[in-house]
């Protein structure tokens, strides 16, 4: 599984930290520590951390971002979107944001290596370009969104005002379209992040598999 690759990286970092600590603390005694004897212990600890913290957090995030995508799709496909639909989108955004914020404690590995972190969470936004696209005639569906024009904060900007759901009457058809496609990119990034940690063999959900195939998401690993 791909997670073992991230485990090796984490183990290396922790080993270096242990070695530095040992050298600084034990300069004046003759006792030696066989660092290799610690490897199974450190490996077990890191495995537990990944299995009990990292992977469940990304599992939760993926499920909640799918919920967000579903709520956005309902609003996007409605001929006349309602305030209740927008409120549901805002509630789903808040739910999806929670596990992402928890994951900020372990943004090494795929989140950093493949620039998924800035794609999901860049701040500040490029509001000038966001508004320029909204006010243009460009096809939003064909856009390759820049990091500061996508992710959680861009979606937040589009659906909230002063911390509350916007009035649905203020959401134009172009904004609704932008909301849909920026959420779709957020979902792509989330599923890729999940798959990079779990490995391709763990992809069993049909919707995940179809998304990865249809959107040509590459699961790179290391």
Q: Can you say where each PLM-predicted feature lies in the sequence?
A:
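Mature extracytoplasmic or organellar-lumen-exposed domains after removal of signal/transit peptides
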Residues: 33-222
């Amino acid at each position: 599984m791909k997670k073992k690759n991230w485990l090796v990286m984490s183990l290396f970092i922790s080993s270096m930290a242990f070695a530095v600590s040992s050298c600084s603390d034990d300069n004046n005694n003759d006792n030696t520590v066989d660092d290799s004897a610690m490897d199974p212990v450190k490996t077990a600890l890191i495995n537990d951390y990944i299995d009990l913290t990292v992977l469940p957090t990304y599992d939760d995030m993926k499920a909640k971002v799918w919920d967000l995508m579903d709520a956005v799709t309902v609003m996007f496909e409605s001929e006349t979107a309602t305030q209740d639909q927008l409120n549901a989108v805002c509630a789903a955004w808040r739910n999806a944001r929670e596990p992402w914020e928890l994951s900020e404690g372990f943004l090494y590995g795929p989140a950093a290596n493949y620039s998924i972190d800035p794609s999901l969470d860049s701040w500040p936004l490029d509001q000038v370009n966001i508004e320029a696209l909204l006010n243009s005639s460009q096809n939003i569906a064909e856009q390759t969104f820049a990091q500061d024009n996508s992710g959680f904060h861009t979606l937040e900007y589009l659906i909230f005002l002063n911390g509350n759901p916007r009035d649905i009457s203020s959401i134009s058809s172009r904004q609704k379209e932008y909301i849909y496609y920026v959420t779709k990119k957020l979902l792509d990034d989330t599923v890729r992040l999940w798959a990079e940690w779990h490995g391709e063999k763990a992809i069993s959900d049909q919707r995940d598999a179809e998304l990865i195939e249809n959107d040509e998401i590459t699961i790179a690993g290391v």
